[in-house]
């Protein structure tokens, strides 16, 4: 699985002009399932993200995780994280997981975060979404479970 994380002071996602998910302080997580990903992959990624110390402590150092700051996660599916731009000018997306499997893993990932006591809001899998955010930092991280 691939995830692009952004530390935010607020974020929301809308479909057809209607807000379907919103958080204040926390992480906006764009997520993409890849071929070969499993429920175990999802659980490991959720655990890793829940432990990431990317929030400032009283000394201003990135030393606190999401739970320690009372933050939430907004999880948004984004198959374009699987883009292959190695040839030509149009990205290819054949490396993304199959839609039915990807949707199941997207939903599993949100559940895995909730099981770790992280409040979670979500987008709508496969929908054309409008995402708004106020980046905090900015802090943006790329995680790929294929990298270990």
Swiss-Prot record:
Its EC number is 3.1.1.96. One of its GO terms (biological process) is D-amino acid catabolic process. It holds the Pfam family Tyr_Deacylase. It catalyses: glycyl-tRNA(Ala) + H2O = tRNA(Ala) + glycine + H(+); a D-aminoacyl-tRNA + H2O = a tRNA + a D-alpha-amino acid + H(+). Keywords: Cytoplasm, Hydrolase, RNA-binding, tRNA-binding. A Gly-cisPro motif from one monomer fits into the active site of the other monomer to allow specific chiral rejection of L-amino acids. PANTHER family: D-AMINOACYL-TRNA DEACYLASE 1, D-TYROSYL-TRNA TYR DEACYLASE. This is D-aminoacyl-tRNA deacylase. The gene is dtd.
